[in-house]
């Protein structure tokens, strides 16, 4: 699963996601993309589940790009632990996804197959998504 090798600070405050994506909102590498219609944090496990679903649907054909990376630590205290005694340890890593972020890109497969693979991947994610085609194709 995806996680950063080295971070400046081990723990971080949760924060909120507001507004639309200013960066990462255009298709850069592939022909087709999966764009978020909501803002949320996506875990490394959800990204991996979506990637596996896409690659299995296209039977390892074509190329898939993951455009988001989980670099936000999510901390959690152990079960049945009293409050206090400091912030909990890092439980997993999240990727911040704003409205309009291109999360996955794909190329080298027919449009119908790419769309079905992206829709299968979107069922693994906690945000509403839409399938987009690069403008300079048609």
UniProtKB/Swiss-Prot annotation:
Gene3D superfamilies recorded: Ribosomal protein L10e/L16
GO biological process: translation
Alphabetical UniProt keywords: Ribonucleoprotein, Ribosomal protein, RNA-binding, rRNA-binding, tRNA-binding
PROSITE patterns (alphabetical): RIBOSOMAL_L16_1, RIBOSOMAL_L16_2
Family: Belongs to the universal ribosomal protein uL16 family.
Function: Binds 23S rRNA and is also seen to make contacts with the A and possibly P site tRNAs.
PANTHER family found in the cross-reference section: 50S/60S RIBOSOMAL PROTEIN L16 (PTHR12220), LARGE RIBOSOMAL SUBUNIT PROTEIN UL16M (PTHR12220:SF13)
Subunit organization: Part of the 50S ribosomal subunit.
This protein's name: Large ribosomal subunit protein uL16
Source species of the chain: Borrelia duttonii (strain Ly)
Name of the encoding gene: rplP
């Amino acid at each position: 699963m995806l996680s950063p090798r080295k971070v400046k600070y081990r723990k971080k405050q949760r924060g909120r996601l507001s507004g639309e994506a200013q960066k990462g909102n255009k298709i850069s590498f592939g022909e087709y993309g999966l764009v978020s219609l909501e803002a949320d944090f996506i875990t490394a496990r959800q990204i991996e589940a979506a990637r596996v679903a896409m690659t299995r649907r296209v039977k390892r054909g074509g190329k898939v790009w993951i455009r988001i990376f989980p670099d936000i630590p999510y901390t959690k205290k152990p079960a049945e632990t009293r409050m206090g005694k400091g912030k909990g340890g890092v439980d997993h890593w999240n990727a911040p996804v704003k409205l309009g972020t291109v999360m996955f890109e794909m190329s080298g497969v027919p449009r119908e197959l790419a769309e079905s693979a992206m829709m299968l991947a979107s069922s693994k994610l906690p945000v509403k998504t839409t399938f987009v085609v690069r403008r300079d194709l048609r």
